[in-house]
Regions:
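Alpha-helical segment proximal to the catalytic Tyr-Lys
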Residues: 35, 39, 80-84, 141
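Residue(s) in the substrate-gating loop at a strand-loop-helix junction
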Residues: 51
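Catalytic Tyr-X3-Lys loop
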Residues: 8-28, 47, 71, 114
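Active-site helix of classical SDR
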Residues: 30, 67, 75
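Conserved mid-core segment of classical short-chain dehydrogenase/reductases
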Residues: 1-16, 35, 60-63, 101-107
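Active-site loop immediately N-terminal to the catalytic Tyr-X3-Lys motif
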Residues: 8, 56-62, 84, 120, ...
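C-terminal substrate-recognition "lid" of short-chain dehydrogenase/reductases
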Residues: 27, 121-150
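Conserved Rossmann-fold SDR core element
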Residues: 72-75, 82-97, 143-150
Length: 155
């Protein structure tokens, strides 16, 4: 969920609502998943989804980026805490994708975003999904505590 505005217009209620979805819900889900893994003596993988806006700085996205940045920090610490039990935690950091959340942007706004990428295009939703699938697989058994960028080379 995105709440976009400039910092001087910050609305605490809207910010809290966004944090409930983007930060607190994934945290609670992670807590319950790990408790279940411990109960059943199983190893596992947790994948969180962030946003390239954490790493680039776009006007009007400070609040949204802060929520995704919080999730990145949480995921890294989760990996450190639970790695010894065989639980891996990573973040996939997608670039701009054509989704319902981005559907209100004008062509000019989209083109400005594409201009900041090496491939000059929207990030493929399929490539993001395939990255998640890879991280969930045994092929990624040595990857934990990482932010994996799938962003068409956003610069």
């Amino acid at each position: 969920v995105a709440y976009d505005d400039i910092v001087t217009n910050l609305n605490l209620e809207r910010l809290k609502a966004m944090y409930n979805v983007n930060v607190f819900t994934p945290m609670m889900m992670t807590k319950n998943v790990i408790r279940n893994m411990i109960l059943h003596h199983t190893k596992g993988v947790i994948i969180h989804i962030s946003s390239i806006s954490v790493h680039t700085g776009y006007k009007g996205l400070a609040m949204y980026a802060s929520s995704k940045g919080a999730l990145e920090a949480f995921s890294k610490d989760t990996a450190r805490e639970w790695g010894p039990m065989g639980i891996r935690s990573n973040v996939v950091v997608p670039g701009f994708m054509a989704t319902a959340m981005s559907s209100t942007l004008t062509d000019d706004q989209r083109n400005k975003i594409y201009a900041r990428t090496s491939l000059k295009a929207a990030t493929s939703i399929r490539s993001v999904a395939e990255t998640v699938a890879f991280l969930l697989s045994e092929k990624a058994e040595s990857i934990t505590g990482q932010n994996i960028h799938v962003d068409n080379g956003t610069i």
